[in-house]
Every structure is written in structure tokens, then in C-alpha cells.
Curated annotation (Swiss-Prot):
<dbReference type="InterPro" id="IPR001515">
    <property type="entry name" value="Ribosomal_eL32"/>
</dbReference>
<dbReference type="GO" id="GO:0006412">
    <property type="term" value="P:translation"/>
</dbReference>
<comment type="similarity">
    <text>Belongs to the eukaryotic ribosomal protein eL32 family.</text>
</comment>
<keyword id="KW-0687">Ribonucleoprotein</keyword>
<protein>
    <recommendedName>
        <fullName>Large ribosomal subunit protein eL32</fullName>
    </recommendedName>
</protein>
<dbReference type="InterPro" id="IPR023654">
    <property type="entry name" value="Ribosomal_eL32_arc"/>
</dbReference>
<dbReference type="InterPro" id="IPR018263">
    <property type="entry name" value="Ribosomal_eL32_CS"/>
</dbReference>
<dbReference type="InterPro" id="IPR036351">
    <property type="entry name" value="Ribosomal_eL32_sf"/>
</dbReference>
<dbReference type="Pfam" id="PF01655">
    <property type="entry name" value="Ribosomal_L32e"/>
</dbReference>
<keyword id="KW-0689">Ribosomal protein</keyword>
<dbReference type="GO" id="GO:0022625">
    <property type="term" value="C:cytosolic large ribosomal subunit"/>
</dbReference>
<dbReference type="GO" id="GO:0003735">
    <property type="term" value="F:structural constituent of ribosome"/>
</dbReference>
Length: 126
């Protein structure tokens, strides 16, 4: 069995159980609700900082994915952002996949897709 594939399956299983880490009292203020991100609780009486039962979970090293597959696409490829054909040609098709930048227009996108097919490079957003 391939080690990378095994670790990707483990990462997928871990991600299903991982909670959304939101800041303390995110539900209370509209400015927090519309901008969901983690901020460490720092209040002296904060139950969340003290890790009390029933309060929201905090990020810690135990929630991270296996080191070998951290940051990889679920398909197992390393993502590389591509703006033109020249950047596409620098990609290693065995371990990297291209993601076409959102600023690329339709004409250049077609050129990139055609060249990717020739080179055998996987495009994540064709």
C-alpha cells in the first residue's frame, strides 16, 4: 500500500472530526459572524481559555494532519498556481498539479489547458 495514499485517507478521517475553530462569542456580534476566524481567548475569566467542558474547542497540535500530506490537495498533488504557459512547463507532473489563477482570461486559459494536456499535467480547475 502506498504510504502517501494511506496518510491522505487518515487526513480525510481526521478532518471529518475536526471542529470549526471560531473565536470566543462569534455568535454575539455581526462583525465576528461575517468574518469567521480564530483569535486566541485572552480574558482573565475566559472559560474557553481555561478549556472548560462544554465550551468551544481551541486549536492545538493534536488537530494537525500528518506531516507528509500537510498542505496537499485531496488528490495527493501539490498545488501550483499558474498564470501562463511558461509557469506550467516548470511543473513536475508526477507530484504537482496546476491551478489556473482566477485573473487568467478565457483565451490564455485555453492555451494553458491545451499545453497541460500535451505535458500530462493535471489541472485542478479546468
Amino acid at each position: 500500500m502506498n504510504e502517501k495514499a494511506r496518510l491522505l485517507r487518515i487526513r480525510a478521517r481526521l478532518k471529518r472530526k475536526k471542529p470549526r475553530f471560531l473565536r470566543q462569542e462569534w455568535w454575539r456580534y455581526p462583525k465576528f459572524k461575517n468574518d469567521p476566524k480564530w483569535r486566541r481567548p485572552k480574558g482573565i475569566d475566559s472559560k474557553m481559555r481555561l478549556k472548560k467542558k462544554g465550551k468551544a474547542r481551541s486549536p492545538s497540535i493534536g488537530w494537525s494532519s500528518p506531516r507528509l500530506v500537510r498542505g496537499l490537495h485531496p488528490s495527493g498533488y501539490e498545488e501550483v498556481l499558474v498564470h501562463n504557459v511558461k509557469e506550467l512547463e516548470a511543473i513536475d507532473p508526477a507530484r504537482q498539479a496546476a491551478r489556473i489563477a482566477r485573473t487568467v482570461g478565457a483565451r490564455k486559459r485555453e492555451m494553458i489547458l491545451a499545453r497541460a494536456k500535451e505535458l500530462g499535467v493535471k489541472v485542478l480547475n479546468p
